[in-house]
A protein has these predicted regions:
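Class II aminoacyl-tRNA synthetase catalytic cores and aaRS-like
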Residues: 1-582
Length: 582
């Protein structure tokens, strides 16, 4: 596995019974020290595994403590039957040594036990990341990350994509999240920006005649952290294809994601083709554009049934229902907990009915139902005896989201989600535009550079809020892995789209001059997407927080506690970039 040198001839993870009797030298960290009646046992750890070492002369251990680094030589010996450890690969052998040398001393008091570092306060972990990364579980996540990225890179090469690096020093974009800005020393008052994504560069590559581009792209966004979003930077498998349709992109994404998830997980994975779910359908049936399809519960539109109701909470509201199979037997406490959850997310209450054996209803909403409503509800929801029907009513904007949260919470509380599989889908047919609630102006919903469905004709003749775009997301188990689009490569369509969103042609020239100019010199139709590498690894390692799959993550407040970033700089450094702090 390694080339022999003065520190080691083998690694701690490779010795087996066939090595018994051999003289070896190993090096690593002292994971544990145990005294068994004058015979000392050490567990020595390196990246490749753990090896038990036996020391009969305790004088050899006078300078040795946990987590110091050592090199030692000795003889490989078969373990006694009662000491065999089948939990580790080297568990049938041990090394007996009379020669140990300390290579790197370690303080006697550790800030936390390496083996249990994941249970330690986050701030302490991030200050001593080099210790946390020794934890085998954490260490393994980073090794898996390396393997996954290597696999992705090889797969893209195999599929004919060319890896091209795009600039890290770029210009600020008027769209998207906040930029990280870098002041220029040579150009007073001007700033570079770290790219939020290689969006414009990869489109320019298509105009430049490159047919299939990809890179494992670093992206930088000044946005708040979440469990599935690292503050500061993240990585994408960014790819773009010339002369390509939406289905061409889907075919590439399906092959890459299916093979990656099959290789690095034992779970069942959706087989291509993945489900295509229109955005409007997803918002109706699942209450989100990031549906977890492992959850069997479905939301149903029932607003029309309550248009003339006397029940004030439903009057002139968007009303949705969720049928929960076999839930009628749940305790009063269970229903109370669900109501408390509903209140915690901003609902004024959570109405429901239980379906009796004779298909009549029992519950607080029943008395507000008209003749025929019960049969209609049972029909629309597919309800059976013993089921529960929940009701969610609110504004047209809020009701879908609230229903989606109730759907998810009920499934979690009843353990309805099948955790043994990865369920992937594409969300398609996103609206191109939406109306800003504060200004009432038409704005882009997502990517302003996507192609509207129907082209220029739809922009000229449709209500902007009815125009759909060739935009799409990939979702896996309720986590958005990627967004993408067929790009708008036609300058006339682009001008009209931006005009509808309140941009003049001069604005377009000023803010997006590179694309505006390039698209006047023969731009090909092109499309692409960018699956999030960190999120993929998070799912494959079954970690709940993205920090656990990043070697040097920031804390939730966007601070690097190990290096002290962001940090102060000198007055001289500020003068060089023409900045004065106030």
């Amino acid at each position: 596995m390694i080339k022999a040198n003065e520190y080691r001839t083998v690694t701690c993870g490779e010795l087996r019974e066939e090595n018994i009797g051999q003289q070896v030298r190993v090096a690593g960290w002292v994971e544990n020290i145990r005294d068994h009646g004058g015979v000392m046992f050490l567990d020595i750890r390196d990246q490749y595994g753990v090896l038990q070492v036996v020391v009969h002369n305790d004088e050899l251990l006078k300078d040795i403590n946990k987590e110091c680094t050592v090199t030692l030589s000795g003889t490989v010996v078969k373990r006694d039957e009662e000491t065999i450890n089948k939990k580790i690969a080297t568990g049938f052998v041990e090394v007996h040594t009379e020669d140990i040398k300390v290579l790197g001393k370690c303080k006697n008091v550790l800030p936390f036990e390496v083996a249990t570092s994941t249970n330690t306060n986050e701030e302490v972990i991030l200050k001593y990341l080099f210790l946390d990364l020794r934890n085998p579980k954490v260490h393994n996540n980073i090794m898996i990350r390396s393997q996954i990225i290597t696999f992705l890179r090889n797969k893209m090469n195999e599929m004919g994509f060319m890896e091209i690096q795009t600039p890290i020093l770029s210009t600020s974009s008027p769209e998207g999240a906040r930029d990280y800005l870098i002041p220029s020393r040579k150009h007073k008052g001007r700033f570079y920006a770290l790219p939020q994504a290689p969006q414009i560069f990869k489109q320019l590559l298509m105009v430049s005649g490159f047919d299939r581009y990809f890179q494992i792209a670093p992206c930088f966004r000044d946005e708040d952290a979440r469990a599935d979003r690292s503050p500061g930077e993240f990585y994408q498998l960014d790819f773009e294809m010339a002369f390509a349709t939406q289905e061409d992109v889907f075919a590439v994404a399906e092959e890459v994601l299916y093979e990656t998830f099959k290789k690095f997980s034992n779970k069942e994975v959706s087989k291509p083709p993945f489900a295509r779910i229109p955005y409007a359908e997803s918002m109706l049936k699942y209450g989100t554009d990031k549906p977890d399809l492992r959850n069997p519960l479905v939301i149903v539109e029932i607003s029309d049934m309550f248009e003339e109701t006397d029940f004030a909470p439903f009057r002139k509201k968007t009303v949705r229902s969720i049928n929960v199979p076999n839930a009628a037997g749940q305790s009063k406490k269970w229903f109370k907990k669900m109501e408390e959850f509903a209140l915690s997310i901003g609902m004024k209450g959570l109405g429901y009915v239980k379906v009796r054996d004779d298909l009549t209803f029992d519950g607080p909403i029943d008395k507000f139902l008209k003749e025929g409503d019960r049969e209609e509800l049972i029909s629309r929801n597919g309800s059976k005896a013993g089921d529960v029907i929940y009701f969610i009513a609110d504004t047209a904007q809020e009701a879908p989201k609230l229903a989606g949260q109730i759907r998810t919470e009920v499934a979690k509380r009843l353990d309805l989600i099948d955790t043994s599989r990865f369920e992937m889908c594409f969300i398609v047919d996103f609206p191109m535009f939406e109306r800003d609630e504060e200004t009432n102006q038409i704005i882009f919903t997502h990517n302003p550079f996507s192609m509207p469905q129907g082209g220029l004709d739809s922009l000229l003749n449709k209500d902007p809020e009815e125009v759909l775009a060739y935009q799409y997301d990939i979702v896996c188990n309720g986590v958005e892995l990627s967004s993408g689009a067929v790009r708008n490569h036609d300058i006339e369509i682009m001008k009209k789209a931006f005009e509808l969103a309140g941009y003049s042609e001069d604005d377009l020239k000023a803010k997006f001059s590179a694309l505006y100019n390039a698209f006047q010199y023969g731009a090909p139709p092109h499309a692409g997407m960018a699956p999030g590498v960190d999120r993929m690894i998070m799912l494959l390692t079954e970690e709940e927080n993205i920090r656990e799959v990043i070697a040097f993550p920031m804390n939730s407040n966007a601070q690097d506690l190990l290096l002290g970033s962001p940090g102060e700089v000198t007055e001289q450094q500020l003068r060089e970039v023409h900045i004065k702090l106030r």
